[in-house]
Amino acid sequence: MNLLRKILFPFAILYGLITSIRNFLFDKGILKSTSFDLPVIAVGNLSVGGTGKTPQIEYLIRLLSNKYRAATLSRGYKRKSEGFVLADENSNAEILGDEPFQFYQKFPDVQVAVDANRTNGITQLLSQNVKPQVILLDDAYQHRKVKAGFYILLTSYDDLYADDFMLPTGNLRESRSGANRANIVVVTKCPKNLSEEKQAEIRLKLKLSCSQQIFFTYIDYDVEIYGKDEKISAAEIKSESKLLLAGIAKPKPFFEYLKNENDECLTFPDHHHFSDADLESIQNKANGRKIITTEKDYVRLKDSKLVSQLYYLPIKSTFINHQQNFDVSILQYIKENLEP
């Protein structure tokens, strides 16, 4: 913890008090939460920064989309539109935000919507001619004006919420006790070979109740990288000199997976809007080499002048074990709460 964060500790106490009072008021029904007559699954985290929400939402889409009419509802962080927007063929990353646009590009049969007001967003989705049967709320763990029926809490293996502090001293949006709302906790970005003993140790550390399930996932990188008109073996590209580009919260694993000693790594803030000056600088740094980026960044850059050099590496969230138990829990919740 750096000195500035230590100095700000009194503000962390104040912020923790404010969020605890807010949660208490929602828990007691003094502040209103709206429920809906269909399965609503909220996915989120206690901390700011990347815990792997996007690949977790994509896992749920793959699980559900062949069985139910699924929809995703996101805030659409840093988008240039306002209010409720339902993705269509005219949508792009500026209208939807990068992550929702990625969902729309990959899963065209799924309704993808954005609205900072999640209550209004769900109401709008339910007013469509084709109504969803289940709604996935992206990054909505603290959005308590909607009472979801099922909560999935994500926490990174190398940054567990049990080891963190409230903002601004740490990165927690609310106190650790907020984890009590979760039906399922997923520890993301684990080592692929994480032992059962270490898994048990983490469960004890997180102090979960008997009714809460815990699962462990790792980042599963694709074996190929993809450009506009071609795909290349990821193993082959590792040996080439290239420019690695990332505008995500925690780019280190991406860089480490692809980097060799001849590569240059270029970072931008999460959800960064690339200016013409940025594009010019990136092109100059690449100097004719391939530019490899994340899938989330690619959706913001694919229509730029970089496209002929630009490639992305897809990732997905893969369970270390007990995947079937996770699937059964989700499907059982939906089955029990689906309107006949």
From Swiss-Prot:
Pathway: Glycolipid biosynthesis; lipid IV(A) biosynthesis; lipid IV(A) from (3R)-3-hydroxytetradecanoyl-[acyl-carrier-protein] and UDP-N-acetyl-alpha-D-glucosamine: step 6/6. Its EC number is 2.7.1.130. It is an enzyme of class 2 (transferase). Transfers the gamma-phosphate of ATP to the 4'-position of a tetraacyldisaccharide 1-phosphate intermediate (termed DS-1-P) to form tetraacyldisaccharide 1,4'-bis-phosphate (lipid IVA). GO terms for cellular component: plasma membrane. Keywords: ATP-binding, Kinase, Lipid A biosynthesis, Lipid biosynthesis, Lipid metabolism, Nucleotide-binding, Transferase. It comes from the Bacteria. It comes from Flavobacterium johnsoniae (strain ATCC 17061 / DSM 2064 / JCM 8514 / BCRC 14874 / CCUG 350202 / NBRC 14942 / NCIMB 11054 / UW101) (Cytophaga johnsonae). This is Tetraacyldisaccharide 4'-kinase. GO terms for biological process: lipid A biosynthetic process.
